[in-house]
A protein has these predicted regions:
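Short, Lys/Arg- and Gly-enriched loop/turn segments at beta-strand edges
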Residues: 50-62
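Residue-level signature for short turns and capping positions that connect secondary-structure elements
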Residues: 25-26, 36, 52
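Short capping micro-motif at the N-terminus of alpha-helices
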Residues: 31, 47, 61-63
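Short aromatic-glycine-enriched beta-strand elements
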Residues: 15-20
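Glycine- and charge-enriched low-complexity intrinsically disordered segments
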Residues: 59-115
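Short, structured beta-strand/loop micro-motifs enriched in basic residues and often containing a Trp
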Residues: 21-31
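Structural detector for short beta-strands of small beta-barrel domains
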Residues: 1-14
């Protein structure tokens, strides 16, 4: 099955991600996942009987749960998941990196150096 990622959030407290995935038939799910890969808006997931491909490459994506998409549920996640990169994906310096469970920031931000 072919899924297009329409929106994504990361949760620094749990080290997991949430993405809105839409199928060709416009079935939408919110996927809560763990893995070494961050699903950016525009990413494509292909699920076959044997493997999961992310943008055409084999990927290690562990789906924790899939929720039926509703705007209310997605808005609730966006409101309560507190990651500066979710609001500013071009963030360069993050003042919360020391509290984050991600070894590397999914958005590429660095921790501010002590002065």
């Amino acid at each position: 099955m072919h899924w297009n990622i329409e929106n994504s959030l990361v949760c620094p407290v749990t080290g997991t991600g949430f993405s809105v995935a839409a199928s060709a038939k416009n079935l939408k799910l919110i996927i809560w996942y763990n893995g070494d890969y961050f699903l950016n808006t525009g990413s494509v997931i292909n699920i076959t009987q044997n493997e999961v491909l992310i943008n055409g490459e084999p990927g290690d994506l562990q789906v924790i749960h899939a929720f039926p998409y509703t705007e209310i549920l997605w808005s609730t996640f966006a409101r309560y998941i507190d990651c500066p990169g979710n609001e500013d994906p071009m963030l360069l310096i993050c003042h919360r990196r020391s509290l984050c469970k991600f070894a590397l920031c999914p958005y590429g931000a660095r921790q501010k150096r002590p002065e």
